[in-house]
Amino acid sequence: MAVEQEHFVHLARPLAPTSMGFTGSAPLTVHIQPQAVFSVIDHAVRRDTRDTQSTRVIGALVGTRSEDGSEVEVRSTFAIPHTENEDQVEVDVEYQKNMLALTLKASPRETLLGWYTTSHELNSFSALIQNFFASPETGTFPHPAVHLTISTEPGAPIATKAYISAPVAVSPERAAESCLFIEVPHKLLFSDAERAALGTATAAAETEARSAPVISDIETLAQSLESVSDLLERVSGFVGEVLDEERDGSHALGQYLMNALSLAPKVSATQIEADFNNHVQDVLMVSYLANTIRTQIDLAQRLATAPLVGGDKEGGEKGKDGEDGGRGGRGGKRGGGGRGGHRGEPREPREPREPAE
């Protein structure tokens, strides 16, 4: 029977004995890429809302797994058709096999990690599907199958949970439809470029024109510094209120602040300013050298093409002189000597004509 608990203790996963020599028992951590979450949300939005269909959707998780099996990264997903009612659940196994084969053919380095659903409810049907994805024939065996739940209710925040299963206190008769779900840590990954793009899209959503210009790097740096300054003021205000006993403190937040302060370099403000100025000078020097090299390349290209242009002009002038000489030769043959032509023989003098009466 599936068990759901809000507060959990992360224990080493208990696995059944395997014949493949896999004995890893380290805790599991799940990393989720944003495109995988968007794919799940798109599947939930486009689901069939007829009464005969289930209120939740399911699909497969595809990604990479570390060598020791302690970390998995969910990179993509694909939907799996299924029907679910009060008595039974049916999954299109052939569709799942074909889609998995196509996905692995497009991304050979990825593998099947588990499955997802758009409901936080864990029941006997969830155990059946979990055992299907963890089986040796169609699942992730000998590695545990990851079960990811994502809430997609309109107007509500998106909440995610990750589980693995263990055959703990399960009778052999009910092993196929029973398992113990153990919640494991998970984290949503995103890069700095994705965060910057999301910030630009958010800024466009707050304007009436629904558009936002792409600012330069200097303006982006200025905005980042302003944001950091605001965050420091908020943290300072929170710490001051806790010290003045105006609000209750948080042990988790205090530990996080201590860890963040321990990472700060133990240097003076003067040294930081000097290092920053040196860095700026290095950047300016690199920019100057890049512009100089670009100018030299342009100049070398112009010098390399200059003789070709001059040779074409000289050849054109010589061609014109030859054409004039040829024309003169033809004129000399006709008449008594043209430009560049041979002299013709003198003609006999004509008799003067008598004037007409």
UniProtKB/Swiss-Prot annotation:
GO terms for cellular component: eukaryotic 43S preinitiation complex; eukaryotic 48S preinitiation complex; eukaryotic translation initiation factor 3 complex, eIF3e; eukaryotic translation initiation factor 3 complex, eIF3m. Residues 311-327, 342-357 have a biased composition (Basic and acidic residues). Keywords: Cytoplasm, Initiation factor, Protein biosynthesis. Signal peptide: none annotated. GO terms for biological process: formation of cytoplasmic translation initiation complex. It is found in: Cytoplasm. Residues 30-169 form the MPN domain. Its main location: cytoplasm. GO terms for molecular function: metallopeptidase activity; translation initiation factor activity; translation initiation factor binding. Residues 309-357 are annotated as: Disordered. PROSITE patterns: MPN. Belongs to the eIF-3 subunit F family. Component of the eukaryotic translation initiation factor 3 (eIF-3) complex, which is involved in protein synthesis of a specialized repertoire of mRNAs and, together with other initiation factors, stimulates binding of mRNA and methionyl-tRNAi to the 40S ribosome. The eIF-3 complex specifically targets and initiates translation of a subset of mRNAs involved in cell proliferation. Component of the eukaryotic translation initiation factor 3 (eIF-3) complex. This is Eukaryotic translation initiation factor 3 subunit F.
